């Protein structure tokens, strides 16, 4: 099975990490944990409220603390926030304690998927498309750096993406458990 203690989903907002992650967790018998939701639960405020009251830097501190605590456990499917890879310590921990799946999505697909979403503080601006392009330019190399497996989700439903990942993960894990 999974050669790492946990399965970790990374990728930009709108890629499907939470939706697909829940499905994969159920399929593989893992406990699903959304890092953003864990932050909300621990802090007792919404993500927009945390950004407004404490700023992005404090949010990133909460994120790093919660991610570290989750990665110290086993048998979790951890859906990270899109910016979790910005912290080098997070990247190191993710790679050390997780098999990492990178879900990629294009900016046009993100704009469609996130059109009505008001819980993304970094997108509460008129220039959403430019912000997403800038984030992609900065974060995509970091997602690729930590990824053990990648999947383009633009034209896949959550069910299709899950089915593809189940097959690819099973094949990948079989290969990694085969004696050399």
From Swiss-Prot:
PROSITE patterns, sorted: SHIKIMATE_KINASE (PS01128)
Binding site for substrate: 36, 60, 82, 139
UniProt entry tagged with the keyword Secreted: no
Gene3D superfamilies: P-loop containing nucleotide triphosphate hydrolases
Annotated EC: 2.7.1.71
Keyword Magnesium on entry: yes
Biological role stated in the UniProt entry: Catalyzes the specific phosphorylation of the 3-hydroxyl group of shikimic acid using ATP as a cosubstrate.
HAMAP family the UniProt entry points to: Shikimate_kinase
Protein name listed in UniProt: Shikimate kinase
Species lineage: Bacteria, Pseudomonadati, Pseudomonadota, Gammaproteobacteria, Lysobacterales
């Amino acid at each position: 099975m999974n050669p790492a203690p946990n399965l970790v989903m990374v990728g930009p907002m709108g890629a499907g990490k939470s939706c697909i992650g829940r499905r994969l967790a159920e399929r593989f018998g893992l406990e699903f944990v959304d890092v953003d939701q864990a932050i909300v639960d621990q802090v007792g405020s919404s993500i927009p409220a945390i950004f407004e009251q404490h700023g992005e830097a404090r949010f990133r501190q909460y994120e790093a603390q919660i991610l570290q605590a989750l990665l110290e456990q086993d048998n979790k499917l951890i859906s990270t926030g899109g910016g979790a890879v910005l912290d080098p310590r997070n990247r190191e921990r993710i790679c050390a304690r997780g098999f990492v799946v990178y879900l990629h999505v294009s900016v046009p697909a993100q704009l469609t998927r996130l059109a009505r979403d008001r819980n993304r503080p970094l997108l509460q601006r008129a220039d959403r498309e430019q912000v997403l392009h800038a984030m992609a330019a900065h974060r995509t190399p970091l997602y690729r750096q930590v990824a053990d497996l990648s999947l383009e989700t633009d034209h896949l439903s959550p069910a299709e993406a899950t089915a593809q990942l189940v097959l690819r993960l099973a094949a990948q894990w079989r290969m990694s458990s085969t004696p050399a």
